[in-house]
Swiss-Prot record:
Role played: Produces ATP from ADP in the presence of a proton gradient across the membrane.
Name listed for the protein in its UniProt record: ATP synthase epsilon chain
InterPro entries attached to this UniProt entry: ATP_synth_F1_dsu/esu, ATP_synth_F1_dsu/esu_N, ATPsynth_dsu/esu_N
UniProt-listed PANTHER family: ATP SYNTHASE DELTA/EPSILON CHAIN, ATP SYNTHASE EPSILON CHAIN, CHLOROPLASTIC
Topological relation to the membrane, as annotated: Peripheral membrane protein
Upper taxonomic lineage: Bacteria, Pseudomonadati, Campylobacterota, Epsilonproteobacteria, Campylobacterales
Location(s) in or outside the cell: Cell inner membrane
One Pfam short name: ATP-synt_DE_N
Name of the coding gene: atpC
Amino acid sequence: MALLKISVVVPEGEVYTGEVKSVVLPGVEGEFGVLYGHSNMITLLQAGVIEIETENQKEHIAINWGYAEVTKERVDILADGAVFIKKESDDRDDAISRAKKLLEDASSDRLAVSSVLAKIESL
């Protein structure tokens, strides 16, 4: 299976870069998945969790909002704010707390925020 290149960038710098099997993005019209060979598109992202599947694990990045450019072989994400939640990390609890704060500050839509927060807590 061909791998997709992905980069997640915020104004302060790069949050994540790598080659992945798939990525699920929180689009403003709903979540959508991207695999290698996807049609080209540019879309707006809402507050949510980017789900990244690598060859041997799943990784998650919480964002408050941003843009994604998708091409056949790569996904470039420019977010206003992002927190990389590493599954096997000593600062995981701190990352989850920062992600919750980022999302709570991102939207006044309490229902949408609580849904994303529940997703983060289940990671």
